[in-house]
């Protein structure tokens, strides 16, 4: 009986540790293939869901993290409004709007990537004007 108590305590500690590790986000390089694809997906979804006429393009990637044991990415993105309209060709080369129509947003996205199925899902997104 006396050996069961330490074993039970050990299992509880180990289980808690594993559960905690599973919830952590760790930094990844910003050029990691699946992270880059997730960023592109997040920007495209932002543009598709944004009611504005003009598209936004990526200006800067801040935080780049991946949840341990998953393909869930956490990212901070700064985007700027361009002169291009939605569904224009080659929006990557569109210049930013200047003057009174200039607008930038800071967004935090969580993207679940399943690249082997070509499937990405936005889990959470929060955007604020900067």
UniProtKB/Swiss-Prot annotation:
InterPro entries found in the cross-reference section: Cystatin_dom, Cystatin_sf, Cystatin_spermatogenesis
Gene Ontology terms, MF aspect: cysteine-type endopeptidase inhibitor activity
Record-linked Gene3D superfamilies: 3.10.450.10
Disulfide links within the chain: 84-94, 107-127
Localization terms from the record: Secreted
Tissue: Located only in seminiferous tubules (at protein level). Expressed in testis and Sertoli cells.
Domain Cystatin intervals: 37-116
Signal peptide: 1-23
Database matches in Pfam families: Cystatin
Superkingdom of origin organism: Eukaryota
Keywords for the protein's UniProt record, in alphabetical order: Disulfide bond, Protease inhibitor, Secreted, Signal, Thiol protease inhibitor
Gene Ontology, cellular component aspect: extracellular region
Broad class of where this protein is predominantly found: secreted
Family recorded in the similarity comment: Belongs to the cystatin family.
The protein's role, per its UniProt record: May play a specialized role in spermatogenesis.
Protein name stated in the entry: Cystatin domain-containing protein 1
Organism: Mus musculus (Mouse)
Lineage: Eukaryota, Metazoa, Chordata, Craniata, Vertebrata
